[in-house]
């Protein structure tokens, strides 16, 4: 689809939040999507599903952030069939607070939940997650034209 992806890392090495945000802000990117695995307090195995986090602290980006989060979550729910927990406003998270472009953190499931974990670790689940996120990004970019 002609989309250029800029990865913050390609190996299992720690990259600081500040470095990730700086890369997104200086790379000429249109969107910043940070992908995470969730876990619950005390490893509560009942918590499960997908979430997309967004920030409203920058008024110029607030609506775009929420729309990006909703679009990716909707697409991801279709491809993974995991529970849709919703979009959640989180102004205190460094990555979302410091991004100067539309951004979201995508929580792709709970490591503490057996069903979610199975999706996260299986290649077919990883492909479904990747497809859902990429479909959502494409929809978000097409909606911004």
Regions from the PLM with identified roles:
Residues 1-145:
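Active-site-proximal helix/loop segments of hydrolytic enzymes
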């Amino acid at each position: 689809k002609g989309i250029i992806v800029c990865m913050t890392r390609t190996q299992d090495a720690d990259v600081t939040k500040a470095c990730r945000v700086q890369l997104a802000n200086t790379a000429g990117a249109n969107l910043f999507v940070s992908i995470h695995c969730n876990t619950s307090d005390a490893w509560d195995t009942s918590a499960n599903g997908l979430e997309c986090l967004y920030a409203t602290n920058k008024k110029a980006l607030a609506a775009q952030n929420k729309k990006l989060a909703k679009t990716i979550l909707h697409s991801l729910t279709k491809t993974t069939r995991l529970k849709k927990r919703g979009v959640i406003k989180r102004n205190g998270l460094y990555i979302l607070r410091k991004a100067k472009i539309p951004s979201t953190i995508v929580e792709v499931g709970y490591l503490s939940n057996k069903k979610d974990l199975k999706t996260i670790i299986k290649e077919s689940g990883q492909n479904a997650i990747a497809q859902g996120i990429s479909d959502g990004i494409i929809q978000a970019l097409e909606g911004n034209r």
